[in-house]
C-alpha cells in the first residue's frame, strides 16, 4: 500500500494509493463527526458510487449533487449546496467527502473551505486526472468568465484515498486526459517515469493493473513531495503549472465546453515546449522527445477555429500573472523545468501558433 505523507503548515495527511481503499473510508472519518455530506455528481454516483455507499453502511450520510462539466465550475452551484447543507442540518461538526473527478474535488474542497469558515474534507478522486493531480495539495476553487480558478482557497484534506480500481469504468477520453498530467510529472521532475511511459505505452493504454498502479503511485509521490516543500506556490510548486498557463487560456477561450482539462494541459505543454525551444531553454532533441510523448498518448481533439491572438489576450488574466508579467514554466531538459517571465509577446504568439498547427 503506497502511502505518501503531505506535510503542510495547515495539516499533515496521507495520500494513499491502494486498490480497494474506498472500502476503508469509514476509518478516515474523525471521531465525533456530525453529518457527512458526499459531494459528487449524479453520473459519478450512478456509475461509481457503489463502493463508497458500501463503505459508509451504518453511517448516515447525505448526497449533494453538483452539475457536471467544467463550464459549471462556478460559484453559484457551491452557494446552492451550502444552502442545502444548512437546510439539512449541517453544523461545524459536519464534514464533506468529495467523490468525483477534478471538478468535484475542487468544488467540494472549496465548499468545505468556506462553509462555517471551514469544515473537514476527505478527498476520494474517481478519475485519473484527479487522482494524480487535482485532489492532492489543498487547492480548491471555481472559475470566473475571465479565467480558471480565480476564486478559491487552500484547504488541505484529512486524507486522499486513491483507488486505481475505480478507473476500470472510466471512459477512454477521460483516461487519456489523466495520462497527460502524468506525462507532465515526467517532464518536470521524474525522468524515470518519463522513460517508463515511453517503454510501457502499450501496457499503460491497455490499463494493465501493474502499469496503472505504478504510474499513479509515482505521480502521487511527486505531487506530495512538491506540495510538502511549497504549499502555496511560492517557488517549487510553480513547476506543477507546466502546460497550465497556456492550457487555462485555451479553456477560457472555449468557454470550458470543448476540451477536458487534461486535453487543454496537453496542448499547453506543446506550446510551452515550443516557447522553451525558441527562447533557448531546451534543446531541439529534448523538445522532439517531449512532443512525441504527448503525441503518442493522443490525439488532442481538433482545435480548428482557435486563434492565437485571442489566446494571447487571455494570458493576462491567468492567476499566475504578477504585476502584469505572465510567468511561464518552460522545459530545460526532460526532468527539469524553469519559471520565466518577461518573454516578448511575439515569441509567445509564435509558440501558440505552432502548437495550434
Curated annotation (Swiss-Prot):
Zn(2+) binds at residues 181, 244, 261. One of its GO terms (molecular function) is metal ion binding. Its cofactor is Co(2+); Zn(2+); NAD(+). Pathway: Metabolic intermediate biosynthesis; chorismate biosynthesis; chorismate from D-erythrose 4-phosphate and phosphoenolpyruvate: step 2/7. It catalyses: 7-phospho-2-dehydro-3-deoxy-D-arabino-heptonate = 3-dehydroquinate + phosphate. It is found in: Cytoplasm. Pfam families: DHQ_synthase, DHQS_C. NAD(+) binds at residues 126-127, 139, 148. GO terms for cellular component: cytoplasm. It comes from the Bacteria. Keywords: Amino-acid biosynthesis, Aromatic amino acid biosynthesis, Cobalt, Cytoplasm, Lyase, Metal-binding, NAD, Nucleotide-binding, Zinc. SUPFAM superfamilies: Dehydroquinate synthase-like (SSF56796). One of its GO terms (biological process) is chorismate biosynthetic process. Its main location: cytoplasm. Belongs to the sugar phosphate cyclases superfamily. Dehydroquinate synthase family. Catalyzes the conversion of 3-deoxy-D-arabino-heptulosonate 7-phosphate (DAHP) to dehydroquinate (DHQ). This is 3-dehydroquinate synthase. It comes from Solibacter usitatus (strain Ellin6076). The lineage of its organism: Bacteria, Pseudomonadati, Acidobacteriota, Terriglobia, Bryobacterales.
Amino acid at each position: 500500500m503506497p502511502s505518501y505523507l503531505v506535510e503542510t503548515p495547515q495539516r499533515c495527511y496521507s495520500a494513499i494509493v491502494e486498490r480497494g481503499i474506498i472500502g476503508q473510508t469509514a476509518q478516515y472519518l474523525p471521531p465525533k463527526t456530525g453529518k457527512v455530506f458526499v459531494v459528487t455528481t449524479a453520473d459519478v454516483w450512478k456509475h461509481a458510487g457503489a463502493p463508497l455507499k458500501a463503505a459508509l453502511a451504518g453511517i448516515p450520510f447525505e448526497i449533494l449533487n453538483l452539475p457536471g462539466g467544467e463550464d459549471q465550475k462556478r460559484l453559484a452551484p457551491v452557494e446552492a449546496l451550502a444552502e442545502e447543507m444548512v437546510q439539512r442540518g449541517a453544523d461545524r461538526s459536519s464534514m464533506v467527502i468529495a467523490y468525483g473527478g477534478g471538478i468535484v474535488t475542487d468544488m467540494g474542497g472549496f465548499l468545505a473551505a468556506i462553509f462555517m469558515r471551514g469544515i473537514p474534507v476527505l478527498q476520494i478522486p474517481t478519475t485519473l486526472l484527479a487522482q494524480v493531480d487535482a485532489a492532492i495539495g489543498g487547492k480548491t476553487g471555481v472559475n470566473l468568465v475571465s479565467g480558471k480558478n480565480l476564486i478559491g482557497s487552500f484547504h488541505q484534506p484529512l486524507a486522499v484515498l486513491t483507488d486505481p480500481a475505480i478507473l476500470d469504468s472510466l471512459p477512454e477520453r477521460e483516461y487519456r486526459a489523466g495520462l497527460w498530467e502524468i506525462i507532465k510529472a515526467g517532464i518536470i521532475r521524474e525522468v524515470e517515469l518519463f522513460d517508463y511511459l515511453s517503454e510501457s505505452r502499450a501496457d499503460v493504454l491497455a490499463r494493465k493493473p501493474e502499469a496503472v498502479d505504478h504510474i499513479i503511485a509515482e505521480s502521487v509521490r511527486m505531487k506530495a513531495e512538491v506540495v510538502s516543500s511549497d504549499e502555496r506556490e511560492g517557488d517549487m510548486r510553480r513547476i506543477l503549472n507546466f502546460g497550465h498557463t497556456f492550457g487555462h487560456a485555451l479553456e477560457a477561450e472555449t468557454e470550458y465546453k470543448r476540451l477536458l482539462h487534461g486535453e487543454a494541459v496537453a496542448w499547453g505543454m506543446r506550446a510551452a515546449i515550443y516557447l522553451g525551444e525558441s527562447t533557448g531553454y531546451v534543446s531541439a532533441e529534448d523538445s522532439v522527445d517531449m512532443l512525441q510523448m504527448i503525441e503518442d498518448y493522443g490525439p488532442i481533439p481538433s482545435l480548428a477555429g482557435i486563434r492565437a491572438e485571442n489566446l494571447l489576450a487571455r494570458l493576462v488574466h491567468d492567476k499566475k500573472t504578477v504585476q502584469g508579467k505572465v510567468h511561464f514554466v518552460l522545459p530545460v531538459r526532460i526532468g527539469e523545468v524553469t519559471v520565466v517571465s518577461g518573454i516578448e509577446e511575439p515569441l509567445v504568439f509564435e509558440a501558440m501558433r505552432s502548437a495550434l498547427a
